[in-house]
């Protein structure tokens, strides 16, 4: 195995373990609420989770921007800037999370107005929301920490944090639901406790592993106007890109919710397959962004191009593996998540769409990582603009006639267009560099 392949795996494998715990966390929550005795419990957690995904996705630049800029600064050996980037990211995360807590009531009103859940789902989703909102400071702070760790080529610490979070979440959720008889509230409290545990452990690991970096701390340079302008200019396109991403995901869930609790539950279960693949692929994307940013910062374009090729090769093998697994065992996997027979039966009809996701989304997932490392955020934004336009065009024209099948078609086309646009942009930025 080539040295660069080993470097990719050293970053990717801990990231895969770390990232796969995210959909596993959702799967555990779905498995718990899926056995509570009604599809409306699944729908409530689905709607509540989607709202928080939207909130956190909007501020995903705290991870992505920090990772790209940190890896480039590391490649330049600008260690004082590496430290300043961490402080900037955590400070911005704190300010944003405080704003979210202060505005939680209008945020809830707006989010649930846009999602339009059924009257059966709404009260349970509201309970979930007003508990989970208190995990926002921990989640956004952990975004900043994780991005910095990835930029430092260290994915082992995020892996440890994610595993610990899931152990805490599973233990707390099971304790509160099965021992204390709580329903959606128990799942929500378990999530918040796990989020804060993860952030606090992340700070402890930062002090333990990077205390020597403190000597590069230079307070006067942290909040210089030029530094903050660059920080936000790099993240501006990521922010706008994320709004497009949120709009697509929000509409997908909302369109499913408007078709009833069963279809919403079906789409939620199938999306777990989508998320499972995406988080595994993000492991290689993280390797791409960390290494691409480092080589780009060092001006080593030969190593950069070789890294891109090798990351795509590993990603292709993973896409093939997931396609085979979903074809052979997708139905059995869904049956493990719920004992609601109406949901299980309906899921079989739409499973083929989930099978298409691995190869349809391969290019989009890998290029996202590479472009984050290069901080080529404008291309990332344009890929989401074009793909979102394609998604909504299909939804508005075909969903009224073909229902949920058209909704899934729109999602598949959406990820394909993302990959195509980024491939064209990469040809201009990387191959001609």
Task: Set out the residue ranges of the language-model regions.
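Hydrophobic alpha-helical transmembrane segments of integral membrane proteins
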Residues: 5-7, 11-12, 22, 41, ...
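Helix-terminus/linker motif at the lipid-water interface of multi-pass membrane proteins
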Residues: 24-43, 112-119, 175-182, 239, ...
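Small-residue-rich hydrophobic transmembrane alpha-helices
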Residues: 42-102, 139-157, 266-328, 362-375, ...
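Transmembrane helical elements of multi-pass membrane transporters/channels
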Residues: 10-29, 131, 142, 151, ...
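Short alpha-helical transmembrane segments in multi-pass integral membrane proteins
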Residues: 1-15, 70-137, 179-239, 292-357, ...
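Alpha-helical transmembrane segments of multipass membrane proteins
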Residues: 27-31, 144-148, 170-175, 203, ...
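Alpha-helical transmembrane segments of multi-pass membrane transport proteins
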Residues: 6, 21-22, 59, 100, ...
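Short runs within selected transmembrane alpha-helices of multi-pass transporters and secretion channels
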Residues: 63, 131-151, 158-169, 187-202, ...
């Amino acid at each position: 195995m080539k040295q660069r392949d080993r470097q990719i795996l050293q970053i990717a494998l801990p990231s895969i373990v770390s990232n796969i715990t995210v959909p596993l966390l959702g799967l555990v929550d779905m498995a718990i609420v899926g056995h509570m005795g009604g599809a409306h419990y699944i729908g409530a957690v689905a709607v509540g989770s989607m709202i928080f995904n939207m909130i956190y996705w909007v501020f995903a630049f705290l991870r992505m921007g920090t990772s790209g800029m940190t890896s480039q600064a590391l490649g330049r050996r600008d260690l004082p800037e590496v430290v300043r980037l961490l402080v900037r990211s955590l400070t911005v995360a704190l300010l944003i999370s405080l704003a979210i807590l202060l505005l939680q009531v209008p945020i809830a009103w707006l989010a649930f107005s846009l999602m339009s859940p059924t009257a059966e789902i709404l009260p349970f989703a509201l309970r979930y929301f007003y508990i989970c909102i208190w995990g926002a400071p921990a989640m956004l702070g952990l975004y900043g920490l994780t991005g910095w760790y990835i930029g430092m080529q260290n994915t082992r610490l995020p892996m440890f944090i994610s595993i610990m979070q899931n152990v805490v979440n599973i233990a707390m959720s099971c304790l509160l639901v099965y021992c204390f008889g709580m329903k959606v509230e128990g799942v929500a409290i378990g999530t918040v406790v796990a989020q804060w545990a993860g952030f606090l452990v992340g700070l402890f690991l930062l002090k333990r592993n990077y205390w020597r970096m403190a000597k590069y701390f230079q307070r006067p340079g942290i909040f210089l106007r030029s530094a903050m302008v660059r920080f936000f200019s790099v993240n501006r396109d990521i922010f706008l890109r994320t709004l497009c991403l949120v709009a697509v995901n929000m509409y997908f869930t909302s369109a499913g919710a408007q078709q009833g609790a069963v279809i919403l539950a079906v789409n939620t279960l199938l999306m777990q397959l989508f998320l499972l693949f995406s988080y595994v692929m993000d492991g290689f994307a993280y390797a791409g962004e960390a290494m691409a940013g480092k080589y780009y910062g060092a001006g080593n374009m030969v190593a950069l191009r070789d890294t891109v090729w090798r990351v795509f090769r590993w990603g292709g093998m993973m896409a093939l593996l997931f396609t085979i697994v979903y074809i052979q065992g997708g139905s059995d996997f869904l049956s493990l998540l719920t004992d609601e027979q109406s949901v299980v039966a309906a899921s079989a009809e739409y499973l083929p769409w989930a099978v298409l996701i691995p190869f349809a989304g391969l290019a989009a997932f890998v290029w996202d990582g590479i472009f984050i490392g290069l901080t080529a955020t404008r291309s990332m934004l344009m890929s989401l603009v074009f793909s979102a336009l394609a998604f909504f065009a299909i939804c508005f024209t075909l969903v009224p006639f073909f229902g949920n099948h058209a909704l899934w078609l729109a999602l598949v086309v959406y990820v394909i267009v993302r990959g195509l646009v980024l491939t064209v942009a990469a040809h201009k930025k990387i191959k001609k560099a």
